[in-house]
Amino acid sequence: MLKLNNNINLNKNNKISEIVQNGGYNKISERLDFIKFLLDDTDLKPMINYIDKDKYFYKDKNILNLLEKKSKSFKSTIKKIGGKLLYVKSGTTGHTFKGISYPDENNLDLCINYGVKVVAYPKKENYGDIKDSSRPENAELLMLKILSSFVVNNQTPHIVLPISTFNTSINIFVSLTKNNIITNKKYDQFVEKCENNEFHDTVSVLISEWADGGDLLDFLRENYNKLSIREWRVIFFQILSVLAVIQTKHPGFRHNDLKANNILLQKINNVDKNNIYKYNINNNEYYVPNIGLRIKLWYFDFACIPGEIDNSKVFADWTDRINVKPEAHPYYDVHYFFSTLTSKNFIPNYKKIPEEVQQFIERVVPKCVKNGTNSTERGRLLLDYNEILKMPEIIYKSPEDIIKYDSFFDKMRPK
């Protein structure tokens, strides 16, 4: 545990406490208010735009200008936000911490959380200067900013909201293992690379919402043989609906790594099983039951919107070999999600899920694009979208087609 000052402004405490006591962050308005209150009394700039909701950023290749991103002391900045940090896990270059704060010192049951993602900039990759907006580490920040507008505009709740970002020195994170604050193999490898001078001296820090339900993969591994058809239907609808919303405004959007462990879950407090959420997807209404969980898309360091958000990783030779290109492909993310989901590495015994759910998945990803020369062993589709359009075996060519026409979602459409 990285201990930091827990004293934050009393007025700020009261505002956040009120949100938590009223049931948490189920409503979009509460999520937006939480971000405002969390940044009170700090000099951090919010990453979302509250006023000009459709304004993203100008064509500029400098991430520092695009996001008004400054270099700051890590400890003093987190102190201003409030609370302490708990180390959660590490990826190849990114490390996740959980911010924990008690707004009311007299009520320790009242706890708020936020996410802190620390990302190093590798030197060996041919991604250019650390200020280059097309570096994967920076493209992810821009993607979160542009996609957050869909939440701000009440078009979908299914995206993790960014709160703020800043740069800081890598040194503080190298010292954490020496002080036995973190003991983790991947983190040890990160420290070793730091000591071998494989990273730049600056790291990027992202403050974001915290999803308290973990990731979808862990949830499904534990519950896949217990979930009802209704619960499967809601989970799949949430994923497909947010893709449909994004692709309507940004047809070229590709997540490029949409698998269950890159999707987070938010628990919904005060669950009323009779609650029905009304979705409007491109002028089509859907009525979605409350199952106590809300998915949120996350991990966008592989994502791109050609012509809007370029990502250097997408232009690499190795990504071209797995059909990850800066080209529109509305079916790619759908295919990758369901192909990986049904592999033994994800759900141990896929045949134990309800037959109706299996049949739905087989309609979305038929055998012709799941095996053989059309797909890699790890589920990467090798066909361009123009080739998909010519294949009658693929009934649905986009996420919107699936929720609009497949019988699996009949119960969600108005009669």
Positions of predicted regions on the chain:
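Catalytic activation segment of kinase domains across protein kinase-like and atypical kinase folds
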Residues: 252-328
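ATP-binding glycine-rich phosphate-binding loop
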Residues: 52-111
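Helical subdomain adjoining the active site within ATP-dependent kinase catalytic cores
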Residues: 20, 24-48, 313, 321-415
